[in-house]
Structures are given as structure tokens and as C-alpha cells.
A protein has these predicted regions:
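Surface-exposed, low-hydrophobicity beta-strand/loop segments enriched in small/polar/acidic residues
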Residues: 1-113
Length: 113
């Protein structure tokens, strides 16, 4: 049996955003509090959990599910950054975060921000 992490310590913010952001994508903060897809190698502030028109909800702390590109992270602590396309990827310039689960077939991870 796996532990249930949904909702664990989740703190979210609503941001006006660039188009193209979808749930599971990494989010970076731009001028005037606008959410955007982080550039390749850029640290991200959270993971998009919902989209309503031009507004997104982004989890800044706690549990989130994210899409990844490149080499699959492993369960445990990994250093992640944006890949420039909305996914997270292994990158030494990123943030060290706890990965609680990896689904290699769907290219998704369960992450504790």
C-alpha cells in the first residue's frame, strides 16, 4: 500500500498567465506576478494544478504531480529545473526537491515542493 499524499501541505496561488500552461507543468514568476513556462535550466516556483481562462492555480508548496522530460528522476531527493517546454527535468542548476513517485510510462512524477 502506498501513502496518500494528495493535499499534503499544499499552498497555492492564483496567477494571470501566459497561454500554453496546463496542469502538471512547471511555473515561473515573471514581472508583475505573471505566471509563465520557465526557460530551460530555470528554477520554477511551482506546478500548475488548474487553468481557468488566462488564470492558473499553482501549487507552491506541498504535494503536486508534474510532467518531466529527459532522464526519469528517482524516488528521493533530485535537483530539478524547467526544460523550456513546461516540463521539469534533472538539472544541477535547479531546486532540490523530494520525489515521492515516478510513472515512467506517463512521464509524470509525484513531487513534494
Amino acid at each position: 500500500m502506498y501513502p496518500e499524499l494528495t493535499g499534503f501541505n499544499t499552498k497555492s496561488v492564483t496567477l494571470y498567465c501566459d497561454s500554453g500552461i496546463a496542469p502538471g507543468m512547471a511555473v515561473a514568476l515573471r514581472a508583475d506576478g505573471i505566471g509563465a513556462i520557465p526557460a530551460s535550466g530555470e528554477k520554477f516556483c511551482g506546478i500548475c494544478t488548474d487553468v481557468r481562462g488566462r488564470y492558473i492555480t499553482a501549487a507552491l508548496t506541498g504535494y503536486a504531480e508534474a510532467t518531466y522530460s529527459g532522464t526519469a528522476p528517482t524516488v528521493g531527493y533530485n535537483t530539478l529545473a524547467g526544460d523550456g517546454n513546461g516540463n521539469v527535468c534533472l538539472n544541477d542548476a535547479g531546486r532540490e526537491l523530494l520525489i515521492a513517485g515516478v510513472d515512467t510510462s506517463a512521464k509524470k512524477i509525484t513531487i513534494i515542493l
